[in-house]
Amino acid sequence: MPDRVLRSSKERLLSGMKGKLFLGALLLGASLVGASTTETDTVKGLADDPVLIQLDSLLFADYFLAGPDSTVEDPTVIGAGPEVSDSVIQYRLALLDEQTPLELDYNEHVARFINVYANNRRQQVSRMMGLGQLYFPLFEEVLDKYNMPLELKYLAIVESALNPRAKSRVGATGLWQFMYSTGKIYGLEVSSYVDERSDPMASTDAAARFMMKLYESFGDWNLVLAAYNSGPGNVSKAIRRSGGKRTYWEIRPWLPRETRGYVPAFIAANYIMNYAEEHEIYAQEVSVSRYDVDTIVLKRLMTFDQLSLLVQVPVGDLELLNPQYKLNIVPIIKGKSYTVTLPREKVGLFVTHEDSLYRYAEAAMPGLTLP
């Protein structure tokens, strides 16, 4: 069970922790994450950071239910979050650190990203909380299968802002941002019609196997995160250049620029997903949850438009639940079977009337073939 036994650095008692934390707060400077920090101060130098780019792309996703604003104040207003002292932030993060084999350290780099989440990107955090209700149960199931720290589920926040169809400037795709070649190595199908890098189940399983392989090489979860982002070669090179240091913070100066912000963003994501409501950020609901869905195997080629008409599920919901179908078409290919995820109550409807639904679809669009 990798890292299940807490290292000696984590065998400290919570009693007596407060004094150390307040001393650390004085060293860092009070209220690093208070509302007094402006967006210009916080995101200066982060404008082209992939984490912020993915966060901002979530504003254009249409997966969310209409309704009252999910934050107490206008999330677009800089400093809309309540002011929270640095010592409180540090103490909360230390409590989370006690509950995981990951090292959730706190410093000015982590504080910078916490401020981004808590003050400058509140609406995006609200949306990620909603998507988390759909994806986190799935992530936890897969991580538990491989006996990995469950907190690694928050890595998808840094990678894709939980947008299943996210695509980076260099072509990394999906919740876990697999490049084409890496996806193929881990068995993900990428074709003109199907991209399993965007399949929540398939890509999560592949990401877990990839991280376990990295853990076998580095034996440290923070180094695994760095290697997931920059590649194991860059981490090994940073270890050599640092004189053989073996922790993320020791080798950080020798890592690529993007990776120097990657682990701090991950630690900040752990914080904000556990303490969002203390910052008056609440989940913006999506139309479905992981516990309310099931899968079927189609026996006939069908478009999302057809399926939407037949089972009365909005196309947007079908896209959210089945992001692996690139053209919104579920293909039929000899020797392969493709599943469709639907709201659970619609699965029963489909199974009960399956043959008549196929006949209706054929009558409506006879001879439909792949484009």
Language-model features and meaning:
Residues M1-M17:
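N-terminal secretory signal peptides that target proteins for export/translocation
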Residues L26-G34:
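Hydrophobic h-region of N-terminal signal peptides that target proteins for export
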Residues Q284-Q312, A364-P371:
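Primarily a LysM-type cell-wall glycan-binding module
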Residues T303-I332, P371:
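LysM (lysin motif) carbohydrate-binding repeats in extracellular/periplasmic proteins that recognize
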Residues M148-R165, V224-G231, E319-N322:
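Short, functionally critical alpha-helical segments immediately adjacent to catalytic or ligand/cofactor-binding
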Residues F113-R127, L162-R169, Q177-G219, I239-P253:
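Substrate-binding clefts and substrate-entry loops adjacent to catalytic sites
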Residues P2, K20, G34-Y146:
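An acidic, Gly/Ser/Thr/Pro-rich helix-cap/linker signature
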